[in-house]
Amino acid sequence: MLIIGTYDENGNPNAMNAAWGGQWDNHKIMISMGKHQTSDNLNLKGEFTVAFATVETMVAADYVGIVSQKKDPDKIAKSGLNVIASENVDAPVFTDFPMTMECRIIEKQKESDTGCYIIAEIVNILCDENYLAKDGKPDIEKMNLITFNPIQMGYNLLGKRVGNAFSDGKALK
């Protein structure tokens, strides 16, 4: 589950969860966005953060997806999430999550009355040092990341590595 961090017009931090998003290419991501306070903030600022929810942050991550900042201005305080300002984009970083991407919108696709697809460049990636592998890169197996399960309306723990991308399939050549 992705947590989208933005600032509103008054500089107040906001967060929402997004289930539909992924890699666009090596340096870009795509997120499917409905009409929310977050989409208003994205239109205003054009920059945001994307954090990865974990088992440990699941309750707060779920909360920010079911409560609108428009209706509850104290949403972030009630979530218990800790916030600092990003050094690279005009958006909040929620330090409770193990890894955060700082992003800048480069394109919106298929805009409609109900939402759009956002394509954003990844400006920087922050990772808590407790979640780094020996090579200094993020180790997602250490993070207890969760994903949204739309079939059973729940959250599932992501698993361990099971193969080598662009390699294991060569056995069938």
Annotate each predicted stretch with a short phrase.
Residues 1-173:
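Basic, polyanion-binding surface patches
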